[in-house]
Every structure is written in structure tokens, then in C-alpha cells.
Amino acid sequence: MRKVIAFALMALLMICFIWGNSLKTVEQSADQSAPVAESLRPVLDPQEKIEKPVFHDFVRKLAHVVEFFALGVFVAGFAVSLGAYLKKTLVSMPILLVLSVAVIDEYIQHFTKRGSLVTDVVLDFAGALAGLGCAWLLFWLWRYIKMRKEHAV
């Protein structure tokens, strides 16, 4: 049960972080992401072939994907832990949860005058699905290895 609570708390903290960022104004958000974009530029675009505003926008989109990837990992951990506790496999609940977070995230941005786009929901959801998929794959691989070791003894 400790794992269930730990993953639930991590997922809730990630949701608060995501929605907290969405509550920021355009200026606050740009001030926060500009230094990150500048520090990543020498690594991702060393010859500076991409225009600065385009690169900044790319980094902002990438940040959303990374945030939602992490959310997907935490939600998958919660679902796997809770499923083991309940002796059930939970698949649709985590998918609907991360989709709901993405939709609400864009809805919040509508009120902060940052604009809300369906493409951003799709991008966020894709990041979350990637996180869910990677985490589920790792959890099932871990269980498979664990079961093989138990049967080998």
C-alpha cells in the first residue's frame, strides 16, 4: 500500500506543477522558459540554424512533453501498484486520467490569456502515453524477470 500512496502523491505533485505553470501569465512563462532555451541551444542547435523564437517555442513544447511523460510514469506506477493490491489490471483509468489532466491544463491556459490549442492537448497526451507505455513496459519486464527467477529456484 505504501507504493500506491507514494505514486499517488508523486502524480498529484506533478499535476499541481503542470497546472501551476499553466496559471502563469505569458510573460511569466516566457521568463521561466527563456533561460532553459538558451542553455539548451548550444546542445540542440550548436550552429544556430533555427531562429530564436522557433527554437524557444520548440523548447516550450518539449517541456510539456517531458512534464506529461513524468506524469505518465507516476500514474502508471500508481495503477500498477493499486492493481497489484486489488488483484486487477488497470489500463483505461490511467489513460483517461492523463487525458483529463491535459484537457484541464489547456482549459486553465484559456483563462490566463495564453491561448488553448487542441494540438497542445494532443502533444501533452502523447507525452503522457509515452510515459505510461515506458513505465508499464518496465514494470512488466521487472515482473517477468522476477517470476523467471522464482521459477528457476
Residue ranges: model-predicted function:
Residues 147-153:
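Short, charged juxtamembrane terminal tails flanking transmembrane helices
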Residues 102-126:
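Interfacial helix-loop-helix junctions of multi-pass membrane proteins
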Residues 83-96:
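Internal alpha-helical transmembrane segments of multi-pass membrane proteins
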Residues 1-69:
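"…centered on the first transmembrane helix and the immediately adjacent amphipathic helix/loop
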